[in-house]
Design a protein with these regions (language model features):
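Short, Lys/Arg- and Gly-enriched loop/turn segments at beta-strand edges
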Residues: 42-51, 89-96, 237
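Structural signal for conserved beta-strand scaffold positions within catalytic alpha/beta enzyme cores
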Residues: 6, 51, 154-156, 209, ...
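FNR/FR-type flavoprotein reductase catalytic core
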Residues: 71-216
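Local cysteine-cluster metal-coordination motifs and their immediate loop/turn environment
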Residues: 112, 190-191, 212-242, 275-284
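Short Fe-S-cluster ligation motifs
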Residues: 235-239, 243-290
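A generic structural signal for residues embedded in beta-strands
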Residues: 36, 84-85, 227
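Short, surface-exposed secondary-structure boundary micro-motifs
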Residues: 39, 87-88, 230
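Ferredoxin-reductase
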Residues: 1-78
Length: 290
């Protein structure tokens, strides 16, 4: 069992947890993830390790409420215990001193960018960070990323904060004034990673993306996380999660990731109804005892 030591709401439907997991904390490197299960009835979900403290034996994870399991996770509180935390899984991010590197985070993908950006900065790189979100309230980890970045940019779809537009617009602006960028790391919604990869392909700028397809065991046994990379089949959990963005078949990835969206929506709606029923019973009992 893994104790939740702290919980913080970062934005609507986005929650940060610090969890006691000594082994994972000791072994964690940037790019690693865990497979988490809240309880006996919960499904297994992959989450990136955002940070770790080997001395304290803790890891930090950030989850966005999308389906039933992430909703269940969001309801956990400080002092509660998670049933399973398996990891660290996946290959660590290869860290090099490129000179100048751009890290791009979209939505909750910003949480995955943070440990990689930190490692790249510690390796001596000039770090340019771009964070994109739909609106100001959904921008996360701004303070943390500003502290390690040589230049920090925000884009929002609605223009409520930073530059109105897409992360590719901000990337284009930066590349026009600095041609020394040697690599781009882009993590976020598939459509965003695809757009960044398509933007950098014609100019031959190395671009790395982190893929989070449907995943169950995290060890390559189930094959659910298979992705097409340069016409070869790879497994994101053991061959990734990071790949050359110019080699990823994003169309196939988007199709596969939509496979269970309808079922996920139905499951979440049923869970919300169940929670509402429990609240009604609790309120009725409280009223009866008043």
């Amino acid at each position: 069992m893994y104790e939740i030591l702290s919980k913080e709401t970062l934005a609507q439907s986005i929650t940060k947890f610090v969890v006691r997991a000594p082994y994972v904390a000791r072994k964690h490197k940037a790019g690693n993830f865990i497979i988490l299960r809240v309880n006996d009835h919960g499904e297994r979900i992959p989450l990136t390790i955002v940070d770790s403290d080997p001395k304290e034996g803790t890891i930090t994870i950030i989850a966005q409420t999308i389906g039933k399991t992430t909703k269940l996770l969001s309801l956990q509180e400080k002092g509660d215990f998670l049933l399973d935390v398996a990891g660290p899984l996946g290959n660590p991010t290869p860290i090099h001193n490129y000179g100048t590197v751009v890290c791009i985070g979209g939505g909750v993908g910003t949480a995955e960018v943070y440990p990689i950006a930190t490692a790249l900065k510690n390796a001596g790189n000039k770090l340019i960070t771009i964070v994109g979100a739909r609106t100001k309230e959904l921008v996360i980890l701004e303070k943390e990323l500003r502290e390690i970045s040589d230049e920090f940019n925000v884009t929002t779809d609605d223009g409520s904060y930073g530059m109105k537009g897409l992360v590719t617009n901000a990337l284009d602006n930066y590349l026009k004034k600095d041609g020394s960028v040697k690599a781009v790391y882009a993590i976020g919604p598939i459509i965003m990673m695809k757009a960044v990869s398509e933007f950098t392909r014609p100019i031959g700028l190395s671009t790395f993306v982190s893929l989070n397809p449907i995943m169950m065991d995290g060890t390559g046994m189930c094959g659910a996380c298979r992705v097409s990379i340069g016409k070869e089949t790879k497994f994101a959990c053991v061959d990734g999660p990071e790949f050359d963005g110019h080699q990823v078949d994003f169309e196939e990835l988007m199709t596969r990731n939509r496979s269970y969206m309808d079922l996920e929506k139905v499951s979440l709606e049923a869970f919300d109804q169940e929670l509402a029923g429990h609240r009604c019973k609790a309120e009725a009992k409280e009223a009866a005892n008043a």
